[in-house]
Amino acid sequence: MKTFVAKPETVKRDWYVVDAEGKTLGRLATEIASRLRGKHKAEFTPHVDTGDYIVVINAEKITVTGNKAAAKTYYSYSGFPGGLKSITFDKLIVRKPEMILEIAVKGMLPKGPLGRAMLRKLKVYAGTEHNHAAQQPQVLDI
């Protein structure tokens, strides 16, 4: 019996919507990353994008434990001398709440073209409204 290898053109991708209200950042991000990779499917193949589309709503209401809200710092570097910028979790969740979950999930996906393709299937929205109703996403309880 031969090992099954999924083909990119035959992979069936479903759409799911996840409500992030009151959820812990890391626990939610690990489950989303696993679903984006397709590890929950029987036909998972490491070098093929077999994951589903995930729409996350209420990203502004995501939580972290302990004092991480004040202590967790996100860095960005422009490439120029003195171009290192930092922002704490508290300030970033007010300014760009979608970015927090995207950064967390991005670190859990493979690095390279396949990981970037998986990350494109993640849609994060700060509020309850999203514009993917035409895809009829199923509610995913995490």
Swiss-Prot record:
It comes from the Bacteria. GO terms for molecular function: mRNA binding; structural constituent of ribosome. Pfam families: Ribosomal_L13. It comes from Tolumonas auensis (strain DSM 9187 / NBRC 110442 / TA 4). This is Large ribosomal subunit protein uL13. Keywords: Ribonucleoprotein, Ribosomal protein. One of its GO terms (biological process) is negative regulation of translation. PROSITE patterns: RIBOSOMAL_L13. Gene3D superfamilies: Ribosomal protein L13. Belongs to the universal ribosomal protein uL13 family. This protein is one of the early assembly proteins of the 50S ribosomal subunit, although it is not seen to bind rRNA by itself. It is important during the early stages of 50S assembly. InterPro entries: Ribosomal_uL13, Ribosomal_uL13_bac-type, Ribosomal_uL13_CS, Ribosomal_uL13_sf. CDD domains: Ribosomal_L13. One of its GO terms (cellular component) is cytosolic large ribosomal subunit. Part of the 50S ribosomal subunit.
